[in-house]
Every structure is written in C-alpha cells, then in structure tokens.
Amino acid sequence: MAPIFRNYRFAIGAFAVIMLILLIKTSSIGPPSIARTVTPNASIPKTPEDISILPVNDEPGYLQDSKTEQNYPELADAVKSQTSQTCSEEHKYVIMIDAGSTGSRVHIYKFDVCTSPPTLLDEKFDMLEPGLSSFDTDSVGAANSLDPLLKVAMNYVPIKARSCTPVAVKATAGLRLLGDAKSSKILSAVRDHLEKDYPFPVVEGDGVSIMGGDEEGVFAWITTNYLLGNIGANGPKLPTAAVFDLGGGSTQIVFEPTFPINEKMVDGEHKFDLKFGDENYTLYQFSHLGYGLKEGRNKVNSVLVENALKDGKILKGDNTKTHQLSSPCLPPKVNATNEKVTLESKETYTIDFIGPDEPSGAQCRFLTDEILNKDAQCQSPPCSFNGVHQPSLVRTFKESNDIYIFSYFYDRTRPLGMPLSFTLNELNDLARIVCKGEETWNSVFSGIAGSLDELESDSHFCLDLSFQVSLLHTGYDIPLQRELRTGKKIANKEIGWCLGASLPLLKADNWKCKIQSA
C-alpha cells in the first residue's frame, strides 16, 4: 500500500480521526440484531485497510487521489487536516546581506521548513563592489549602494511572502577597521533605509551590525557541515570538517578537536559550545583580525616601507609624493604601482614597487612568515601565531577529516588551474612557480586557459600565494602533506557564513512579519 502520510505522527493522528468517523457511521445504523440477515453481495463498509490512498502531495493539506476525496470525504478531510496542522507553510525565505571589506553580497535562501532540519531548496546570489566601508563618512550613500542587491531580492521573493521574509545585514572586518563612529552611522543609515523603503522585516537587535569574528567563523562551519550532511542528519554523530576562511581583512579558523581522555580544551574566548539538531559540539574558533589577504599585503609592504625609513631611502612624513622601492614579493620585470601602504602609526605612503632582477620567492616567504609574529609570547600553549592559543591540528584533528579552505584561498588558486583538492605542498609549489616570473609562466601555464592573463593583469599573485602558504603552514601548523579542499559551492549551494547565519532566522524569535499597508 502506498504510504499515506509524511511520517508516523500524521498516521497516528489521522487514524484516530478515521476510527472515530467509522464508529459514528456504525452507531447510526442502530444496535446489532441477533437474527440480522446479511444479503449476499451486499455492500460491506470498508475498513481503513481496504482503502488505497496515494501519497500526500508536496503541498500540505492536498490529497492527490481525487476518487478518495469524492467517495470518502471525511477520510480525505482527516488526511488534509493532519498535514495542514503539522506544517501550514512549506516554503520560507531569508535574505542575508554580507557587507564585506571589498564588496557586498546578497544571499536569498528558500527553505522547505516541513523537514528537520529545514531543507535548503534554492539560493539566489548576487554581489557588487565596493564595500560599505569605502563610503567612509557618506552613510546615506553606503545604504543606497545596497539597492541593486535588494532589487534582486524583490524580484526573487514572491509578493505574498515578502512581509514575512526577514532581512539581515552583517558587516565583517572591513567595517570594523573603519572605527566605531563611522561604522555606526553607516549601519544606522542602512537599517533606516531597509525599514522605510522595503517590505521585508528587518531582524531586531543585531540584525544590522558588525558581526563578531567568532560568529563569522562558526556560521561558516555550520554552513559547510550542513551542506556536507555532517550535521543535522538523523543517525549517529558524524566527523566534521574544519573550516579556514580568508577574507580581505581577517581570517577565521573553526574545527572540532578531539582530545585524549585525560585532556580537554582550554577555556577561553576561542571555545564555542554549539547545539545543532540533537547534537552538541565543542568547537575551537578564532578570528585573526588584520590577517586577511589585503591586510596581509599591507603588513608585508609595511615592513618594506619601515626598512626604507630606517635606511633613509624615504624620509619620515614625506608622504605627499610617490616613492619607488624594490619588493621580493614581485616576480622579475613585474611592477605594482600606486600602492597605498598604511603603517601602524597610521601614516600612509604611496609606493611604486619594482620587481627584482632575479626571482626572490624565498625572501618573500621570509617576509610573509615574519608578519605572523610567530615568536610572540604564548601564555596558553600551544599557540598558532601572534600569541593565540590553538589546539594542535596534528594531535587533535584526524587526518581522515576534511579541511576546507574558502574565499580568497579559492579565488587566488582556481584561476591558475589548481584543482578543488590539493596538498599544502602543491600550493607551496604553485607560489614558488608564480614568483619566478614570466619565462616560467609561459612554460607552466600556457595550457591553462586564462591563467596567463590573470598573472599578467594582477601583480599580487606571488605575494598572495606566499602569504597563504605561510598562514596555513607556519601560522596554523598544517603539515605540507595534508590534503586541502576548496570551492565556492557544496551541493551547488554557495559556501560561506551566510547560510549558517540564516538558519536561525527561520524561527521568528527576533523579527516580526511586517504589517502590509493598504
């Protein structure tokens, strides 16, 4: 017999109603007679087991078998009543805007909320540049810059669903670096614009805010492991993947360490207890502000400028003109012009960096290692870099567990032909080859479509790849032979923190449907 209900709870409820209906029908015939005669071939009332009902349709409260509806209306009503009461609304939408350091991105998610956990059915994604932080004091301009993304949301979310589709704007490292006063004005203008000019309810409290680094990393971990099916699924607890995210202003690490019986994670801000579905997870997470890709570039270039100031090649305070300096993080014959370098003193110098006569990849790696401040005092061993405690990945994270590296890790490797899975040593080889320059490029990358154009149009590849190797190997202590996975999507869904941050918004705990004006 085809299954009647979506799950056994529907079956129990509906079966009770069916039996009540049959009992009422039977009682209306009158008390049974001892000498009651049954006429041959007479129509005998059917029991529920005799009735064949097709599965309930995807729409709650809809019965596919029209014959059953006609002949047994009470039974059909019972089925529809049970499904409707349990799940009155299948599809819900959530709008999440990621206001990053280099640009803003909108993710519009469509969920089936009749499953546990909710099933992600579809995602609409779009992005634009520049980021909110580039507007500096123009807070209204910053708010209006999101209009193209919100137009995408207006076109995607059905009209009837808009008033109950929450929207949140989460800014990351770029806006943090702008300072409290400027960032607060921008966020206030964004909230005001959303509330006045759009039909979507804005999430209360921290719905429009600068996201804490711990949240950013943990939400990315949730997204990744949710899409991989590692969390939220029925059955035994599964091993989870580690997540390393590299943005423009910061980098995050999140993983679930396992300790020997007599050990446990050291308490501190790095420890994050998470409940997802029926399982509890104790995660290590940390957001290294100032160690995103673009901040890493600036740190390396700052070392070169500071050295030039010490050597008298640049006079302190002489920042009204463009200076020329050689950089080991450029391949031979490659220049990086008009680079703005901001020192710790907040002084900014404009530099034209010139590539050396000979490849200097080793010297570049020395610089990218140096900025990690690996020798900083470690008050709670073991530490990764800059004095930050981190459980050893070698000791507490099995080699069979996946490591995923996202965002700029993907953006700087994929255009050069790297696969979606490679060892850290292979990434190290790529950095070494890129830093050698044009002659080597022509022999190595000629068969990879578009890669030579990428290298010739962007002078930062040598520095960026060297920094990534330093960050993963010297910083996080990942062995060179360890396999890494990367990508922009899992199961055709965008990777990042946004999905993980959107899942809690399916419960209207901190937002209310907007009242539609007449």
From Swiss-Prot:
Residues 1-9 are cytoplasmic. Keywords: Glycoprotein, Golgi apparatus, Hydrolase, Membrane, Signal-anchor, Transmembrane, Transmembrane helix. The keyword Hydrolase applies. GO terms for biological process: nucleoside diphosphate catabolic process; protein glycosylation; protein N-linked glycosylation. GO terms for molecular function: GDP phosphatase activity; ribonucleoside triphosphate phosphatase activity; UDP phosphatase activity. It is found in: Golgi apparatus membrane. Pathway: Protein modification; protein glycosylation. Its main location: Golgi. It catalyses: GDP + H2O = GMP + phosphate + H(+). It is an enzyme of class 3 (hydrolase). Its EC number is 3.6.1.42. Glycans are attached at N41, N280, N335. The keyword Amino-acid biosynthesis does not apply. Pfam families: GDA1_CD39. GO terms for cellular component: Golgi apparatus; Golgi membrane; membrane. Residues 25-518 are lumenal. It is a single-pass type II membrane protein. The chain crosses the membrane at residues 10-24. The active site is at E216. PANTHER family: ADENOSINE/GUANOSINE DIPHOSPHATASE, GUANOSINE-DIPHOSPHATASE. Present with 8680 molecules/cell in log phase SD medium. Homodimer. Belongs to the GDA1/CD39 NTPase family. After transfer of sugars to endogenous macromolecular acceptors, the enzyme converts nucleoside diphosphates to nucleoside monophosphates which in turn exit the Golgi lumen in a coupled antiporter reaction, allowing entry of additional nucleotide sugar from the cytosol. This is Guanosine-diphosphatase.
